[in-house]
């Protein structure tokens, strides 16, 4: 109580921040009259004037009032829109690297222009991040009018652009694009072989629109570039049939809250027996160690059938399983579930099963956006997640006041016992609203529920529009016209829709939709005037009816999504109303103990069709939602700790890779690698302080043959009186250096430098790809360490570091081995440019695409493991060429590199297969 009184007297921290911005607003308003009288040319000259001030040492904060006033005047002249004072404050919040929470309809898109223009004056580039291509194109064209008028260049990154177009867009002062495109371009750039081929500039400043959707809802989902792995289509089909025909109710246990399902003991026995019958299981125990892969695929088939529902979690479109985003209801084209789950869903639905893939590069949005020195964001709903924004991203949230008071009436929830009673009440309300010409927006949590409600309305002959992932293309137009008199619009989650619902209808959308074929001229002007009059008249009708009525058919597990739905009504001081209709059969109610409530309602004598309405129920639901939000925050925080381990390693690898590309030559690096490999080779065979008879000269001789490609008299050297390991290291080093000097003399220094650089990059990429796979495997089982009273995170850090050191050692060895064996044919006058890796861009898991590993031009140096490099015969003929490897003759395999696939065809690395015996 006293806290509330104190806040009323002195204001909270947010109020004080907003109050502090008003002084700057007054300064900007004082400049406005001076700019009104300027000609367009004079106003445009202010951009150069502001840049000159920056060049002379002033800061962005110093020029902020003049820059904001300039943008405001330019917006009036180009768009016919003037920034309100609260919008100016929103621009200041963005400029200082914070998140501005602004209600729907407060003009977030226009607010961004202020901070974007100011920061773009430095010439380092500003990125504006949106949630889909439509908004990126719309905003870059719409707001781009302001920037171009003021002499700044604008680029737009959308799907389907080639590298030249992307490079030009990133070179612009301001670049609009989606979070996916920015992230994938970063990963692709770090797979390029020349700096000139990269498309992005160094990061400077990013403003993220719908920041809660991108940095929280999608934070757990990594961006992945991948290439194909083994084909297991027949296994998925077989296991799908086993689960479909064998597993019945009672054979499995399901935990909806944890989204987990597992076989019971009886179910396990039935599945194991069926697997033996079809020959997939050789023994009666499904959980034997050698059946671990089979168990994994059985579990994924079980999840596909018992946890994932068509038209709720995914839809089937064009012979593909397409994931539906649980927060926005959008189709996530190109995104796939990981670890074989997507293939299990494809088998379940009978569509073409795409091959599993191996990760080539990946990053989460959490770590991608933390690469920007300055980051800001905008959204209508961020305060509920303010703690997470601060803890993970260091981004404070400022709740901006509205330009006009909010007049929307948020009514208490109505709770019914069954879903049928709930839908009957919703339809009654819709009919009442239509009778008074009040538009209704109905929010559902899934496609299935939206189509169910649509069927009810069809039976009642109520005209309506349905907006869900199936009709993505018409999305913007349907939303824009949802404010017309009597309109009924059913929409899956409204998060991130990006288009305002304007009462009476949306002028721009109607012009675009109805007059697209009408050329400029008097006839078009008359048609526009007619549409404008129709919208004005329609708005009056809607205002008298009470504005837009928002109906929620279920509570989402996140309060933020519910608030976004409510926020569609009551924009810019318009009247409106909102109400949620719930039933005890809803997911959130069922998961959080609706059985007890059902018993209580029956005792109270609640009749069919009656609802219980009380603020206590609202509070109880909000508490349940708060618990879920806290749980999800903990999951994201924990995942980030693990991803940070890989992120630190990623930074090192990408930085080293860029240094290699930037260097004129890498001779010193490969020489250093060669010397380290020789030292390690000798140290393994001749341990420190060991007696001569303890030296493993046979092993050393074989390693010298394999790595250096020469039959050197190592055993004879070891027998020499008084020889030490340092002497052997020196002789091997001298031999290797002389051999490389001979190659340089034969092929020329320029060609050798190109070969060294090309090989180092290619082998680094291959090693990094293998390392990512190893980290994936490590991550999957690391939580089991908790049973041994060990901290899984510390274990993961320790072992991941060990794997990283192993990767670097393997990199040094492979680079040395390949360079010692390399022969350049005379036809190779010019070394071809290394091929760019080809990979599928996916969310969460790989999708099918050719790997591109075989796409090297003829004449490119190749290696015997059929990857990128193949040694030609060395010197006077010690090493056989790759073509002499015979699959059935293990004796011919002895010079196969240790990390290459074994020639026997097992799929294992040579060092883990036939290479073990050496």
Swiss-Prot record:
Q: How is the cofactor bound?
A: May bind 1 zinc ion per subunit.
What is the membrane topology here?
Answer: Peripheral membrane protein
Q: GO annotations under biological process? A: intracellular protein transmembrane transport; protein import; protein targeting; protein transport by the Sec complex
Question: What class does this enzyme belong to in the EC scheme?
Answer: translocase
- Kindly list the positions annotated as binding Zn(2+): 902, 904, 913-914
Q: Which residues form a coiled coil?
A: none
Gene Ontology molecular-function annotations: ATP binding; metal ion binding; protein-exporting ATPase activity
Recorded catalytic reaction(s): these are: ATP + H2O + cellular proteinSide 1 = ADP + phosphate + cellular proteinSide 2
- Recorded E.C. number(s)? 7.4.2.8
So where does ATP get bound? 87, 105-109, 500
Cellular component, GO annotation: cell envelope Sec protein transport complex; cytosol; plasma membrane
CDD domains in UniProt: DEXDc_SecA (cd17928), SF2_C_secA (cd18803)
Q: Does the keyword Transport apply?
A: yes
State the UniProt keywords alphabetically. ATP-binding, Cell inner membrane, Cell membrane, Cytoplasm, Membrane, Metal-binding, Nucleotide-binding, Protein transport, Translocase, Translocation, Transport, Zinc
Q: Where in the cell is it found?
A: Cell inner membrane; Cytoplasm
Stretches of Basic residues bias are at 908-918
Q: Where is this region: Disordered?
A: 876-918
Q: Name one Pfam family in it.
A: SEC-C
User: Which PANTHER family does the annotation name?
Assistant: CHLOROPLAST PROTEIN-TRANSPORTING ATPASE, SECA INNER MEMBRANE COMPONENT OF SEC PROTEIN SECRETION SYSTEM
Q: Which HAMAP family does this UniProt record tie to the protein?
A: SecA
Tell me which family the UniProt entry assigns to this protein: Belongs to the SecA family.
Summarize subunit and interaction data from the UniProt record for this chain.
Monomer and homodimer. Part of the essential Sec protein translocation apparatus which comprises SecA, SecYEG and auxiliary proteins SecDF-YajC and YidC.
Q: What does this protein do?
A: Part of the Sec protein translocase complex. Interacts with the SecYEG preprotein conducting channel. Has a central role in coupling the hydrolysis of ATP to the transfer of proteins into and across the cell membrane, serving both as a receptor for the preprotein-SecB complex and as an ATP-driven molecular motor driving the stepwise translocation of polypeptide chains across the membrane.
Name used for this protein in its record? Protein translocase subunit SecA
The species is Rhodospirillum centenum (strain ATCC 51521 / SW)
Instruction: List the top taxonomic levels of the source.
Output: Bacteria, Pseudomonadati, Pseudomonadota, Alphaproteobacteria, Rhodospirillales
């Amino acid at each position: 109580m006293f806290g509330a009184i104190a806040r009323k007297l002195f204001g909270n921290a947010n109020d004080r921040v907003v109050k502090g911005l008003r002084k700057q607003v007054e300064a900007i308003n004082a400049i406005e009259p001076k700019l009104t009288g300027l000609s367009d040319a004079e106003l445009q000259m202010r951009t150069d004037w502001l840049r000159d001030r920056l060049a002379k040492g002033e800061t962005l904060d110093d020029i902020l009032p003049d820059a904001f006033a300039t943008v405001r005047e330019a917006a009036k002249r180009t768009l016919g829109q003037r920034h309100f004072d609260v919008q100016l404050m929103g621009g200041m919040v963005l400029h200082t690297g914070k998140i501005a929470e602004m209600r729907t309809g407060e003009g977030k898109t226009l607010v961004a222009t202020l901070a974007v223009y100011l920061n773009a004056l430095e010439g380092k580039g500003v990125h504006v991040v949106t949630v889909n291509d439509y908004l990126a194109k719309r905003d870059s064209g719409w707001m781009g009018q302001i920037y171009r008028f003021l002499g700044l260049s604008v680029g737009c990154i959308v799907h389907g652009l080639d590298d030249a177009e992307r490079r030009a867009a990133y070179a612009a002062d301001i670049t609009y694009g989606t979070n996916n495109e920015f992230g994938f371009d970063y990963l692709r750039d770090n797979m390029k072989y020349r700096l000139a081929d990269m498309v992005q500039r160094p990061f400077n400043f990013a403003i993220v629109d719908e920041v809660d959707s991108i940095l929280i809802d999608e934070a757990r989902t990594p961006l992945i570039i991948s290439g194909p792995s083994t084909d297991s289509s027949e296994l998925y089909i077989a296991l799908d049939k086993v689960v479909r025909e064998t597993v019945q109710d009672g054979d499995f246990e399901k935990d909806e809250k944890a989204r987990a399902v597992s076989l019971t003991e009886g179910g396990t026995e039935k599945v194991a027996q069926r697997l033996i019958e079809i020959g997939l299981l050789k023994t009666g125990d499904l959980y034997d160690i050698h059946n671990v892969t089979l168990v994994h695929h059985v579990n994924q088939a079980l999840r596909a059938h018992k946890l994932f529902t068509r038209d709720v979690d995914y839809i089937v479109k064009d012979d593909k399983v397409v994931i539906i985003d649980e927060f926005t209801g959008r189709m996530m084209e190109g995104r796939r579930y990981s670890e074989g789950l997507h293939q299990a869903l494809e088998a379940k639905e009978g569509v073409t099963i795409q091959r599993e893939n191996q990760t080539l590069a990946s990053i989460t949005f959490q770590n991608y956006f933390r690469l920007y020195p300055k980051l800001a964001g905008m959204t209508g709903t961020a305060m509920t997640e303010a703690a997470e924004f601060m803890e993970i991203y260091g981004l404070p949230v400022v709740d901006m006041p509205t330009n006009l008071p909010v007049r929307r009436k948020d009514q208490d929830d109505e709770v019914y016992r069954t879903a049928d009673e709930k839908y009957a009440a919703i339809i009654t309300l819709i009919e009442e609203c239509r009778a008074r010409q009040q538009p209704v927006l109905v929010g559902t949590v899934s496609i299935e529920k939206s189509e169910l409600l649509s069927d009810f309305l069809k039976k009642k002959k109520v005209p309506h529009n349905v907006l869900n992932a199936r009709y993505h293309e018409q999305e913007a137009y349907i939303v824009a016209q949802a404010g017309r008199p009597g309109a009924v619009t059913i929409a899956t989650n409204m998060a991130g829709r990006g288009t305002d619902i304007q009462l009476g209808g949306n002028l721009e959308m109607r012009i675009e939709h109805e007059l697209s074929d009408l050329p400029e001229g008097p006839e078009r002007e008359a048609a526009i005037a007619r549409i404008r009059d129709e919208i004005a008249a329609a708005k009056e009708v809607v205002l008298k009816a009470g504005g837009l009525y928002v109906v929620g058919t279920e509570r989402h597990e996140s309060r933020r999504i519910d608030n976004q739905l409510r926020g569609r009504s009551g924009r810019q001081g318009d009247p409106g109303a909102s109400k949620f209709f719930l039933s005890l059969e809803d997911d959130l109610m069922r998961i959080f103990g609706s059985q007890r409530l059902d018993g209580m309602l029956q005792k109270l004598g609640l009749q069919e069709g009656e609802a219980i309405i009380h603020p206590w129920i609202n509070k109880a639901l909000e508490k349940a939602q708060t618990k879920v939000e806290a749980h999800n925050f903990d999951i994201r925080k924990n995942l980030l700790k693990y991803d940070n381990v890989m992120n630190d390693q990623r930074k090192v690898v990408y930085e080293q890779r860029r240094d290699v590309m930037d260097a004129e030559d890498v001779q010193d690096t490969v020489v250093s690698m060669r010397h380290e490999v020789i030292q390690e080779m000798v140290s393994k065979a001749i341990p420190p302080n060991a007696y001569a008879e303890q030296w493993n000269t046979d092993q050393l001789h074989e390693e010298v043959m394999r790595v250096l490609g020469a039959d050197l008299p190592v055993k004879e050297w070891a027998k020499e009186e008084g020889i030490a390991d340092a002497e052997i290291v020196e002789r091997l080093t001298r031999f290797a250096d002389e051999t490389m000097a001979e190659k340089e003399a034969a092929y020329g220094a320029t060609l050798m430098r190109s070969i060294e650089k090309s090989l180092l990059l290619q082998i680094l990429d291959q090693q990094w790809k293998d390392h990512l796979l190893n980290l994936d495997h490590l991550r999957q089982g690391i939580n089991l360490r908790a049973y041994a009273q060990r901290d899984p995170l510390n274990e993961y850090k320790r072992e991941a570091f060990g794997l990283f050191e192993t990767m670097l050692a393997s990199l040094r060895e492979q680079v040395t081995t390949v360079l010692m064996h390399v022969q350049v044919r005379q036809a190779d006058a010019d070394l071809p440019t290394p091929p760019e890796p080809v990979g599928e861009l996916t969310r969460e898991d790989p999708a099918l695409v050719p790997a591109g590993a075989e796409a090297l031009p003829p004449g490119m140096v190749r290696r015997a493991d059929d990857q990128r490099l193949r040694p030609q015969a060395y010197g006077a003929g010690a090493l056989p060429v790759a073509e002499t490897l015979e699959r059935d003759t293990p004796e011919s395999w002895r010079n196969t590199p240790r990390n290459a696939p074994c020639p026997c065809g097992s799929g294992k690395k040579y060092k883990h297969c036939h290479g073990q015996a050496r």
